Curated annotation (Swiss-Prot):
GO terms for cellular component: cytosol; membrane. GO terms for biological process: ribosome disassembly. Belongs to the IF-3 family. The gene is infC. Keywords: Cytoplasm, Initiation factor, Protein biosynthesis. It comes from Macrococcus caseolyticus (strain JCSC5402) (Macrococcoides caseolyticum). It comes from the Bacteria. Monomer. This is Translation initiation factor IF-3.
Length: 178
């Protein structure tokens, strides 16, 4: 029966409300009680009064084991964090006049990234007068997207940004794996 909560949860004597709508440890409604009556009832069964809905009128409190409640809350948060996936964006840089072997090497690397479910940004930097032949870069990016279509979808079509043209590929994720 601790009365000190390290987070913002109000328990036992730390509850500021004078009256509470009380829920018993087995889930039954005990009605509106004063804070002191609620604490007295909780002490009889060796449990804590925990404020679960502070903004309700009157605030809702439940009789429960605070330590167990806190443990369950942490477990739920841990599960939620485990299910989250951080999406990383990997960049592959090409040139508008890339040779076939270099293209295939970059393609192989991009496919590895897509298999790991990372997004891939494919960019082409135009140097000097090459900017006048944007269609070369466009063709290279379209060929790259075509080669990856079994693993990825085009999230953003080839687009110019200053002296660079880029394409964004997102992995195709199977819903069955999750």
């Amino acid at each position: 029966m601790s009365t000190i909560a390290k987070d913002q949860t109000q328990i036992n004597d730390r509850i500021r409300a004078k009256e509470l709508r009380l829920i018993g440890h087995d889930g039954e409604q005990l009605g509106v009680k004063t804070k002191f009556e609620a604490i007295e009832i909780a002490e009889r069964v060796n449990l804590d009064v925990v404020l679960v809905a502070p903004n309700a009128k009157p605030p809702v409190a439940k009789i429960m084991d605070y330590g167990k409640f806190k443990f369950e809350q942490q477990k739920k948060e841990k599960e939620a964090r485990k299910k989250q996936k951080v999406v990383t964006v990997k960049e592959i840089r090409l040139s508008p006049t890339i040779e076939d072997h270099d293209f295939n090497t970059k393609l192989k690397n991009a496919r590895k990234f897509l298999e790991k479910e990372d997004k891939v940004k494919v960019s082409i930097r135009f140097r000097g007068r090459a900017i006048t032949h944007k269609e070369f870069g466009q063709r290279v990016l379209e060929k790259f997207a075509e080669e990856c279509k079994d693993l990825a979808t085009v999230e953003q079509k080839p687009k110019m940004d200053g002296r660079s043209m880029f394409l964004m590929l997102a992995p195709i994720v199977d819903k069955k794996q999750n």
